[in-house]
Design a protein with these regions (language model features):
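Post-transcriptional modification and biogenesis factors for structured RNAs
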Residues: 1-216
Length: 216
């Protein structure tokens, strides 16, 4: 049996079903393939090279290919942006995501990507800091508070845990105090800040770009 129910594929603008149908040709013997998906088709939101793979096989491959950074999100008020940040972390190769504070979070924006990525829960900012320090990671906050450093001119630690706050209030004071540094995205417009999901995507992409360049 597959690791998740195969839903009817969403319909795109051309009227065609997304995903792929049943496997055509000789059935592969590679254990990464899911017999049920091979027989019925794969409508999941996964990259083409993961089509027909089991969920466990995808998770293991993502662990192997992940970059040496993690992401943490303060969940103090059930922010709807958390799902979007988790999805971006999956797309850009984060090794792990931590939900800090409330255990329950809105998964809708994650588009099921949290099933393939290691997502855990920690009760507090201090618990996150303790976990990261014990594994050699450095907390790097992202917020436009006094004293924050411009992202474009700041060299981030390779093994950073990028920490994002809530849409309305940003990072908590406790979290800021625990961060090695806090970076901000330079802006030119009139708004004081951008959406936290968008800001997270920019910071993660920039850090992932530099880490990927080191591996080339």
């Amino acid at each position: 049996m597959s690791d998740e129910t195969i839903p009817l594929g969403p319909i795109n603008e051309g009227g065609a079903s997304c995903g792929v149908g049943p496997w055509e040709g000789p059935v592969p013997e590679d254990p990464r393939y899911d017999p049920e998906l091979l027989a019925l088709g794969d409508r999941r939101n996964v990259e083409d090279h993961y089509r027909y793979w089991t969920m466990d096989a995808i998770r293991e491959d993502l662990k192997r290919r992940s970059l040496p950074f993690e992401v943490a999100i303060e969940n103090l008020g059930h922010d709807f942006n958390i799902g979007s940040i988790v999805r971006t972390a999956n797309a850009l190769g984060a090794a792990r995501v931590h939900i800090v504070g409330r255990r329950r979070w809105n998964r809708r924006g994650a588009m099921v990507t949290d099933r393939y990525l290691e997502v855990d829960h920690v009760d507090s900012a201090q618990a996150l800091a303790d976990s990261c320090v014990s594994r050699g990671l450095v907390l790097v906050g992202v917020d436009n508070v006094p004293g924050s450093l411009p992202l474009e001119s700041t060299e981030l630690p390779r093994r950073a845990c990028l920490v994002f706050g809530e849409e309305s209030n940003g990072l908590s004071e406790e979290m800021i105090d625990l961060c090695e540094c806090v970076v901000k995205i330079s802006q030119r417009g009139s708004t004081r800040s951008m959406n936290v999901g968008h800001a997270a995507a920019i910071v993660m992409w920039e850090h992932a770009r530099k880490l990927s360049a080191e591996q080339e």
